[in-house]
């Protein structure tokens, strides 16, 4: 492991660890999203806690966490495997934040931020699948899982470099893992829908 790679990898994890959902809530709304709705710090629960504007701020912040270190890795590191690893490090940081005692979100927006840098067409596929699924089902969790499935599929069909396809597969696995409780609630019919503030 070269020192530039180590520095960028660690920087990616640390930036990924910044909890934008909590920062936006406390700075602008006086609300901790962990006390609202699903208790998650990501975009969907931020919509419940702060409304649309706050949710957009969280989305942009969380996507930036993935995009910025990945862009730096592509620019300054020689191997695409390194860029893919840095992208994954940002997701790990978001999901298991050093600033939140290794707890965190589910990594969906951060995954998207990385994909925007690695493959813009795959990011478009992610967004299209998310929007379609959310519009039809009103389940953000299901939309996030299916959108994450679209990433490695799109990258494979577009013949993206193998490290990017592997990134997409690992990122999908992380998204599914972090949505384990959502999947159980979807199966039980108790999952929160978009716009719902608390479970019924």
Please give the residue ranges for each predicted region.
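N-terminal signal-anchor transmembrane alpha helix
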Residues: 1-28
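Nucleotide and nucleotide-moiety/phosphate-recognizing core
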Residues: 4, 8, 53-99, 118-122, ...
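Alpha-helical transmembrane segments of multi-pass membrane proteins
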Residues: 12-15, 90-94, 130, 134, ...
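C-terminal ends of transmembrane helices
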Residues: 21-24, 93-103, 130-137, 180-184
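Cytosolic, membrane-interface loops and tails of multi-pass inner-membrane proteins
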Residues: 22-53, 182-200
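Short, non-helical or kinked segments that cap or interrupt transmembrane helices
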Residues: 31-43, 99-112, 139-147
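Interfacial segments of multi-pass membrane proteins
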Residues: 47-51, 73-76, 93, 108-137, ...
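Loop-to-transmembrane alpha-helix initiation sites
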Residues: 124, 140-148, 159-171
């Amino acid at each position: 492991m070269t020192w530039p790679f180590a520095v960028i990898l660690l920087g990616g994890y640390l930036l990924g660890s910044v909890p934008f959902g909590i920062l936006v809530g406390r700075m602008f709304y006086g609300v901790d999203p962990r006390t609202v709705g699903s208790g998650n710090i990501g975009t969907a629960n931020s919509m419940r806690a702060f409304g649309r504007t706050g949710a957009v701020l969280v989305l942009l912040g969380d996507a930036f966490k993935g995009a910025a270190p990945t862009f730096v890795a592509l620019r300054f590191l020689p191997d695409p495997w390194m860029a893919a690893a840095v992208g994954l490090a940002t997701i790990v940081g978001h999901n298991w934040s050093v600033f939140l005692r290794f707890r965190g979100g589910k990594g969906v927006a951060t995954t998207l931020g990385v994909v925007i840098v690695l493959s813009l067409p795959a990011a478009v596929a992610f967004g299209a699948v998310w929007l379609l699924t959310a519009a039809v089902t009103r389940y953000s969790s299901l939309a996030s899982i299916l959108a994450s499935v679209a990433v490695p599929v799109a990258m494979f069909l577009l013949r993206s470099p193998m490290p990017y396809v592997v990134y997409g597969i690992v990122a999908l696995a992380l998204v599914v893992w972090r949505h384990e409780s959502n999947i159980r609630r979807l199966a039980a019919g108790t999952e929160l829908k978009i716009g719902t503030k608390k479970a019924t």
